[in-house]
């Protein structure tokens, strides 16, 4: 799979133009991956940048979802390690939730890989706009007390979010954070830390299935993975130092811009 154009003819000017355009696309997606990982390591939502960006350069939906999962694994590994090293990964049932997220994502990925590209091209913009509206309208809970009656429901929620990540993905991290705050009453930093682990699990499950089915564009994924590592390291360090105060304004701005771009497209 070549991005974004296939070379036709043998004239040097055509070849030079092709190389220039392909290199430009790689450079743009590298930058996008860096900022997506930076944002995602703080509060989730990085897929709201990478997914539409890859679609806009002409990649098929399944190639987009597969390559996005591959490169995202590198960012989530980096941010998970940073939060763990700084003592924020304290959730006692983290391995249980990780398993739920992994299984849910696997089921979602198996489903999405059976859907035609034409259907995905119609569904993905709708899901993106819905996720963007969610970030804009939801103010987020503060001071929520732990609700023991909803723990069983929470297990289903973790599975469902994992399924969503395997089926589509953008906004998964933010949904996990909100679930831990609203249902379990965890604080924002602990919620963010466990979210990175669950997101890593769901990303990896989806990546394995997509890789087996041959949808991953490896060279593009590796280029974006380098940016993911740098962005996740920078973002998680920034979040650990500054906390929640900068997260929501960034997400709202990004969501608005993406919604406008998708509607125009």
Identify the function of each model-found stretch.
Residues 60-68, 91-93, 185-196:
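Membrane-interface alpha-helices at helix entry/exit sites of multi-pass transporters
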Residues 78-88, 117, 125-150, 259-265:
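Transmembrane helix exit motif
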Residues 26, 69, 125-128, 132, ...:
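Residues within membrane-spanning alpha-helices of integral membrane proteins
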Residues 15-60, 143-192:
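Selected transmembrane alpha-helices and immediately adjacent juxtamembrane segments
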Residues 25-29, 93, 97, 121-124, ...:
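Residue-level signature of transmembrane alpha-helical entry/exit and packing/kink sites
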Residues 1-16:
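Single conserved hydrophobic/aromatic residue that forms the stacking wall/gate
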Residues 66-119, 203-249, 253:
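Selective hydrophobic functional segments
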